[in-house]
Amino acid sequence: MMKINNLPRLIRTFLPATLLMLPLVWQTPALAQSASCTQGSTCVSVGGNNDPMSKEQARQSQQQWDETNRLRNKMNNRVEKDFDKNDRAVDAKDNCERSDNLNAYWEPNTQRCLDRLSGRKINP
């Protein structure tokens, strides 16, 4: 049996060793997980687990991000297309109003330069 007076000596001996080993034990799972993730690959980890549920959640999260990104790109393309259309219309209106053709007028609803006599589109 161990005597009570030996307990403090035992604690003084093993406590520093335990404290030195704790960081190594703490880092071992992280090193094992990062070893499976190679450079250049996309590694997604949710909570550090490799169970099928966390993989499915990561897949769904990635899929949702991809869909959001795709929609964002569509919206940006639409805005850019509308801006270009309006920009061309402003240039066409300026050209129509500065035209030497006295019968040319700008139709704001259709955003075209038309001939007053025939109603046909003209290029000033």
From Swiss-Prot:
Outcome following mutation: M21I: In strain: 487/90 / Serotype 6
Keywords on record: Signal
Superkingdom: Bacteria
Keyword Hydrolase applies: no
Pfam families: DUF1283 (PF06932)
Signal sequence residues: 1-32
InterPro entries cross-referenced by the UniProt entry: DUF1283
Outcome of substituting I11M: In strain: 487/90 / Serotype 6
Location of the region described as Disordered in the Swiss-Prot/TrEMBL record: 47-68
Family indicated by similarity: Belongs to the UPF0482 family.
HAMAP family according to UniProt: UPF0482
Name by which UniProt lists this protein: UPF0482 protein YPTB2194
